[in-house]
Amino acid sequence: MPSLTPRCIIVRHGQTEWSKSGQYTGLTDLPLTPYGEGQMLRTGESVFRNNQFLNPDNITYIFTSPRLRARQTVDLVLKPLSDEQRAKIRVVVDDDLREWEYGDYEGMLTREIIELRKSRGLDKERPWNIWRDGCENGETTQQIGLRLSRAIARIQNLHRKHQSEGRASDIMVFAHGHALRYFAAIWFGLGVQKKCETIEEIQNVKSYDDDTVPYVKLESYRHLVDNPCFLLDAGGIGVLSYAHHNIDEPALELAGPFVSPPEEESQHGDV
């Protein structure tokens, strides 16, 4: 009997020219490199066939960033699936999962950003920290925290529904380096909680086009104030779930995607 504890499987897109060089890639719509394509084909083979970490029958939704590099990664990872298996999985393009909007820092390296900010008279008292300071003419940490909190609320709402129906539910999220590390951090409560009060925070934003995904209105959201100190290289996979089978106890699965089969009695994360 499979575990009924839902999981959120986060997947960073494969290698691009800018992920290889370390340039900040937000709205720039780069494709995967040939290496990145092969990388994600191998990942799909590993998680679906060799490792058997993912059962296609348990995948209820895939949410993806609209950027080409993320959508290419979805297609490549799903290659091992049959047409019938693939047809049963709903793929939802969700603009809330786009990468951090870097503004003036798009295409730059970290050292170049630090020099630019220094030339503008910034960071005299403490060094730049994107998780706290955001990006000039791009997104603040509050703005990205708000939209990722919306995405998390929708996924956790779906998990709650599927669990109540007795269905196994793996939901996959394909996105980007900064966005997914931020997503993982606030999934289980890092950062600070802020009540939705401003027009931007309380407005109804539907960032996807799929009527099977219920809209969830936020009363509050979370945003970071420091680096969560997570690593997720291009092509990397992480696992988020819930402690004690309880949707109200979101947790990080430290073992990641390569785990021993759970004991039949404990099922998943029960102690």
From Swiss-Prot:
<keyword id="KW-0119">Carbohydrate metabolism</keyword>
<keyword id="KW-0539">Nucleus</keyword>
<comment type="subunit">
    <text>Homodimer.</text>
</comment>
<feature type="binding site">
    <location>
        <position position="12"/>
    </location>
    <ligand>
        <name>substrate</name>
    </ligand>
</feature>
<feature type="binding site">
    <location>
        <position position="69"/>
    </location>
    <ligand>
        <name>substrate</name>
    </ligand>
</feature>
<dbReference type="GO" id="GO:0016491">
    <property type="term" value="F:oxidoreductase activity"/>
</dbReference>
<feature type="binding site">
    <location>
        <begin position="99"/>
        <end position="102"/>
    </location>
    <ligand>
        <name>substrate</name>
    </ligand>
</feature>
<comment type="function">
    <text>Sedoheptulose 1,7-bisphosphatase involved in riboneogenesis. Dephosphorylates sedoheptulose 1,7-bisphosphate (SBP), which is converted via the non-oxidative pentose phosphate pathway to ribose-5-phosphate. Has a fructose 1,6-bisphosphatase activity in vitro, but this is probably not biologically relevant, since deletion does not affect fructose 1,6-biphosphate (FBP) levels.</text>
</comment>
<feature type="binding site">
    <location>
        <begin position="24"/>
        <end position="25"/>
    </location>
    <ligand>
        <name>substrate</name>
    </ligand>
</feature>
<dbReference type="GO" id="GO:0046390">
    <property type="term" value="P:ribose phosphate biosynthetic process"/>
</dbReference>
<comment type="similarity">
    <text>Belongs to the phosphoglycerate mutase family. SHB17 subfamily.</text>
</comment>
<feature type="active site" description="Proton donor/acceptor">
    <location>
        <position position="99"/>
    </location>
</feature>
<dbReference type="InterPro" id="IPR029033">
    <property type="entry name" value="His_PPase_superfam"/>
</dbReference>
<protein>
    <recommendedName>
        <fullName>Sedoheptulose 1,7-bisphosphatase</fullName>
        <ecNumber>3.1.3.37</ecNumber>
    </recommendedName>
</protein>
<dbReference type="GO" id="GO:0005737">
    <property type="term" value="C:cytoplasm"/>
</dbReference>
<feature type="site" description="Transition state stabilizer">
    <location>
        <position position="176"/>
    </location>
</feature>
<keyword id="KW-0560">Oxidoreductase</keyword>
<feature type="binding site">
    <location>
        <position position="181"/>
    </location>
    <ligand>
        <name>substrate</name>
    </ligand>
</feature>
<keyword id="KW-0378">Hydrolase</keyword>
<dbReference type="GO" id="GO:0050278">
    <property type="term" value="F:sedoheptulose-bisphosphatase activity"/>
</dbReference>
<feature type="binding site">
    <location>
        <position position="244"/>
    </location>
    <ligand>
        <name>substrate</name>
    </ligand>
</feature>
<keyword id="KW-0963">Cytoplasm</keyword>
<dbReference type="Pfam" id="PF00300">
    <property type="entry name" value="His_Phos_1"/>
</dbReference>
<dbReference type="InterPro" id="IPR050275">
    <property type="entry name" value="PGM_Phosphatase"/>
</dbReference>
<dbReference type="InterPro" id="IPR013078">
    <property type="entry name" value="His_Pase_superF_clade-1"/>
</dbReference>
<dbReference type="GO" id="GO:0005634">
    <property type="term" value="C:nucleus"/>
</dbReference>
<feature type="active site" description="Tele-phosphohistidine intermediate">
    <location>
        <position position="13"/>
    </location>
</feature>
